[in-house]
């Protein structure tokens, strides 16, 4: 695995990654704000074809837009990041899909979890985003398009657009064969 924008401080050992973000880091392209940011921290590996990636993570969310989760990246103009983002004083499940321009969807969490498990599955032109809060049952959060037939980088990401020093911890990151394409099959 390698870094796209290594953070100023990080440690990794035995399936455990902890990082502290640099100042005003983010991934975003154009929409609403009119700027491009490609300064977030992304610890990734390259994957060919279809796959499923899973990670458990937590963060010390305190400032506007503090965020942690998983990213799938084809290049600087085509990517998806998903996880927790702190906005309006609340943790939100968050997905940003970028195909030249970024979009953003959020779901507020009234009971902030200690840890979130996130699962991203790529099947051709689709990336399915699923989450689990405190148990083994995954729920779908988003189904998004990313151009098929291109290698992708996938791995943990974290950003802090309004500050430095956001601490995020990731555990048990795994990439393997894709789960079933069926969106509504029981697990």
Over which residues does each language-model region extend?
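Extracellular glycan-recognition regions
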Residues: 1-187
């Amino acid at each position: 695995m390698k870094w796209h924008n290594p953070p100023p401080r990080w440690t990794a050992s035995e399936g455990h990654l902890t990082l502290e973000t640099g100042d005003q880091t983010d991934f975003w392209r154009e929409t609403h704000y009119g700027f491009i940011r490609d300064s977030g921290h992304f610890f990734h590996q390259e994957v060919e074809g279809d796959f499923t990636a899973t990670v458990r993570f937590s963060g010390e969310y305190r400032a506007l837009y503090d965020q942690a989760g998983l990213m799938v990246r084809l290049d600087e103009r085509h990517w998806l990041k998903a996880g927790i983002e702190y906005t309006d004083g609340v943790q939100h499940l968050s997905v940003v899909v970028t195909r030249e321009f970024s979009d953003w969807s959020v779901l507020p969490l009234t009971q902030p979890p200690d840890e979130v498990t996130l699962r991203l599955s790529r099947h051709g032109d689709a990336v399915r985003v699923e989450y689990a809060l405190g148990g083994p049952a995954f729920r779908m959060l988003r189904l998004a398009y990313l151009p098929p037939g291109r290698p992708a980088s996938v791995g943990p990401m974290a950003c802090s657009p309004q500050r430095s020093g956001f601490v995020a911890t990731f555990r048990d990151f795994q990439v393997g064969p894709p789960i079933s394409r069926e969106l509504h099959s029981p697990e």
